[in-house]
């Protein structure tokens, strides 16, 4: 699984997200690689018609109803998303919300991509059986220095911590991934994909 988190960059604003979805669909089909796109929420409807996995960048553990401004899983699912990032380093949430969201999204049959910053979090949260755990050391995010070269031991330790949970959770890695070599190294170290 390769996840493209679009964040809120201008390069994907408006119809530019459609171009990204078309290219991702083509690459996914050609190389038989699942590709997910996590666009800003208001752009979700523009890409759900393409054959790519669509993830919300964040969802809130709030109720349906009088919750203005919150991203409610049951409501956002109707936009045809396939899952959500949870606890991204740029939008960390408390442990209780993490646990509740994973349960809630599982009930809704949505993929859960739980972001962690270290091995301790990986061990703790792997027991919740999210679809994926993505290890992203915050000090490498946005630096162009890849986890697979700067801290390869974190990937192997995270792989081991996920395996200890003895469930179906798979490990992804992120932070500073900028080249095909970074991806290849991460996969050789046991990562099942990239965020």
Regions found by a protein language model. Give the residues of each.
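Active-site-adjacent beta->alpha loops and helix N-cap segments on the catalytic face
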Residues: 13-19, 39-49, 64-74, 89-105, ...
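Catalytic-face loop-and-helix region of soluble metabolic enzyme cores
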Residues: 137-140, 167-170, 174-177
């Amino acid at each position: 699984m390769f996840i493209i988190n679009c964040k809120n960059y201008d390069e994907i604003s408006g119809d530019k997200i459609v171009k990204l979805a078309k290219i991702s669909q083509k690459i996914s089909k050609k190389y038989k690689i699942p590709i997910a796109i996590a666009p800003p929420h208001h752009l979700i409807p523009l890409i759900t018609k393409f054959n790519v996995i669509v993830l919300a960048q964040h969802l809130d553990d709030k109720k349906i109803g009088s919750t203005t401004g919150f991203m409610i899983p049951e409501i956002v699912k109707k936009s045809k998303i396939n899952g959500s990032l949870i606890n991204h380093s740029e939008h960390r949430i408390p442990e209780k919300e993490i646990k509740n969201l994973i349960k809630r999204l599982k009930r809704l049959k949505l993929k859960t991509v739980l972001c962690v910053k270290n091995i301790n979090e990986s061990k703790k949260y792997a027991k919740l059986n999210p679809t994926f755990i993505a290890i992203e050391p915050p000090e490498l995010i946005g630096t162009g220095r890849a986890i697979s070269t700067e801290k390869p031991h974190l990937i192997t330790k995270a792989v081991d911590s996920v395996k200890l949970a003895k469930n179906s959770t798979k490990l992804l890695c992120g932070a500073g991934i900028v080249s095909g070599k970074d991806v290849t190294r991460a996969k050789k170290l046991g990562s099942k994909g990239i965020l």
